[in-house]
Amino acid sequence: MNEQELKQMIEGILTEMSGGKTTDTVAAAPTKSVVETVVTEGSIPDITEVDIKKQLLVPEPADREGYLKMKQMTPARLGLWRAGPRYKTETILRFRADHAVAQDSVFSYVSEDLVKEMNFIPVNTKCQDKDEYLTRPDLGREFDNEMVEVIRANTTKNAKLQIVVGDGLSSAAIEANIKDILPSIKQGLKMYNLDFDNIIFVKHCRVPSMDQIGEITGADVVCLLVGERPGLVTAESMSAYIAYKPTIGMPEARRTVISNIHSGGTPPVEAGAYIAELIHNMLEKKCSGIDLK
């Protein structure tokens, strides 16, 4: 499938998901880089709402337009300034705020209401809490006998595809993207007469947990949608790890990975269409990872 065909497939999925309605895209009006701070009853505006791509703190730059054009190409913290040897207060506060968001995403859990709403099958790895999950990665790859039976009893044996959702290192990534990407994958698979059901949700999930799920279910392809380690740019980045007939202890080279799935990277709807195509190719060629190249 070439780039034009992939684009047409994505447009078709979007049209079908919206009930055939099309929406005109209106360009957002540019906002000023200088935000006036208004204190009301002892509170100030949320500093994280400032678009750092449009914020230039360098006083009297030689080429303001060129600087701002460069900042549009990257979310990196360019165009900062200093007071003596240190960063300005606004820069320090924004750094700490973004770091706090990343920490919150790691230590929080995916909402139980979301798991119920999506009709996921909830299971847990051998980790008992977040501390054990972070310090014992090996336990995040395995299920105890009770969880093995839950997986076996609630999934279709030897299915062509098993979809798995895992919290990973970012619960925010799952909550931000999962409602958009799953319908996109399902719509994309319809083009190849493929479908899936009985989605597993793994709490305290590490990527290799998909290998044991593959052995339990006997699925031809296992696709794991998992929250990735958050950074200072975003805490909502999700990845898809896909493997053909995964087995415990298999080399990482057998996995195909699509990363950086979020609103500021690869949009979840677009990623879903590409994932559907990859799953079809794996089933056709009976391989994944570097063998699929």
UniProtKB/Swiss-Prot annotation:
The pathway entry for this protein reads as:
Amine and polyamine degradation; ethanolamine degradation
Compartments where located: Bacterial microcompartment
The family note in this entry says: Belongs to the EutC family.
This protein's source sits in the domain of life called Bacteria
Residue positions annotated to bind adenosylcob(III)alamin are V207, E228
Q: Cofactor comment in the record?
A: Binds between the large and small subunits.
Tell me its cofactors. adenosylcob(III)alamin
Question: How does this protein assemble?
Answer: The basic unit is a heterodimer which dimerizes to form tetramers. The heterotetramers trimerize; 6 large subunits form a core ring with 6 small subunits projecting outwards.
What's the EC number here? 4.3.1.7
- Which organism encodes this protein? Listeria monocytogenes serotype 4a (strain HCC23)
Q: Where is the signal peptide?
A: none
Encoding gene (name): eutC
Keywords in UniProt for this one? Bacterial microcompartment, Cobalamin, Cobalt, Lyase
User: Matching HAMAP family, A to Z?
Assistant: EutC
Tell me, what is an example of a GO biological process annotation in this record? amino acid metabolic process
Put simply, this protein is called: Ethanolamine ammonia-lyase small subunit
* Record's GO cellular component terms: ethanolamine ammonia-lyase complex; ethanolamine degradation polyhedral organelle
Q: What is the lineage of its organism?
A: Bacteria, Bacillati, Bacillota, Bacilli, Bacillales
* UniProt-listed Gene3D superfamilies: Ethanolamine ammonia-lyase light chain (EutC) (3.40.50.11240), Ethanolamine ammonia-lyase light chain (EutC), N-terminal domain (1.10.30.40)
The protein's enzyme class: lyase
Kindly give the Pfam families that the UniProt entry links to this protein: EutC
- Give an example GO molecular function: cobalamin binding
